[in-house]
Amino acid sequence: MFFQTTIVAALAFLAVATPLALRTDSRCNTESVKCCNKSEDAETFKKSASAALIPIKIGDITGKVYSECSPIVGLIGGSSCSAQTVCCDNAKFNGLVNIGCTPINVAL
């Protein structure tokens, strides 16, 4: 009986003492999470009037373009997110038009 208790206690000690591995696969922090009310393909965006608002070569844009973005923290004040929650860790042109964001699945 004493031997079993010692083994269980030793295993419990090892489980508690083992350090947790730091996950570095996702760098999206709370400041990078945005709620974007509009999302469109880059090709559609290139044809829109909004494309004239950003000072980069339009041909360089690929993937999705998100607009009307606000921080998730702002949702507490009564805003609503009707399209897509994104991580804008490496985003360009924060707010009006966001390029370089990654969609994330967050239940709000």
UniProtKB/Swiss-Prot annotation:
Chief location bin: secreted
Inducing or repressing factors: Expressed throughout the culture in cell wall extracts, but increased when the aerial development becomes prominent. Expression is impaired by carbon source limitation.
Phenotype caused by lack of the gene: Alters the cell surface structure and mycelial hydrophobicity. Exhibits relatively slower aerial mycelia formation on a liquid medium and leads to slower growth under stress conditions involving SDS and H(2)O(2). Leads to a marked delay in lignin degradation on beech wood sawdust medium, while the production of lignin-modifying enzymes is not reduced.
Residue positions the entry lists as glycosylated: N37
Superkingdom, taxonomy of origin: Eukaryota
UniProt KW keywords: Cell wall, Disulfide bond, Glycoprotein, Secreted, Signal
Family: Belongs to the fungal hydrophobin family.
Protein name: Class I hydrophobin 3
